[in-house]
């Protein structure tokens, strides 16, 4: 079984905003430290722009307790939550792996028939 996902994970920009607020750093200072424009950082913080690989790398250098994969994973979870519900009703199963029932008999899960 796949791990459970957050139904509506927050945009990673909210975490950045929270961290900056906690540190008493404004957007202008943070943008300079990250070597990005204030507008670009503001768009991320306000959820209007996603975190790219380059930004993830910069954030991991600025917030040394994180790595780029952390920031990209947050963005991926957010992105998946945004498209998941839109696609769920429009896509049909093409293949599903077989599994064994309680008696060790192989069952095709998509057809619920014993092979």
Curated annotation (Swiss-Prot):
Which Pfam family, any one of them, does this sequence belong to? HTH_3
Keyword Lyase set for record: no
Q: Which InterPro entries match?
A: Cro/C1-type_HTH, Lambda_DNA-bd_dom_sf, Toxin_antidote_HigA
Q: Name one GO molecular function term.
A: DNA binding
SUPFAM superfamilies in alphabetical order: lambda repressor-like DNA-binding domains (SSF47413)
Q: Which NCBIfam families match?
A: antidote_HigA
Q: What is this protein called?
A: Virulence-associated protein A'
What is this organism's lineage? Bacteria, Pseudomonadati, Pseudomonadota, Gammaproteobacteria, Cardiobacteriales
């Amino acid at each position: 079984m796949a791990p459970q996902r957050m139904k509506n994970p927050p945009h990673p920009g909210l975490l950045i905003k929270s961290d900056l607020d906690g540190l008493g750093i404004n957007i202008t200072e943070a943008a300079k430290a990250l070597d990005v424009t204030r507008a670009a950082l503001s768009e991320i913080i306000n959820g209007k722009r996603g975190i790219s690989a380059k930004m993830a790398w910069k954030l991991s250098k600025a917030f040394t307790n994180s790595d780029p994969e952390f920031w990209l994973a947050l963005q991926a979870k957010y992105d998946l939550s945004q498209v998941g519900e839109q696609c769920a009703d429009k896509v049909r199963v093409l293949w599903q792996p077989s599994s064994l029932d309680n008696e060790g008999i192989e069952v095709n899960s998509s057809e619920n028939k014993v092979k």
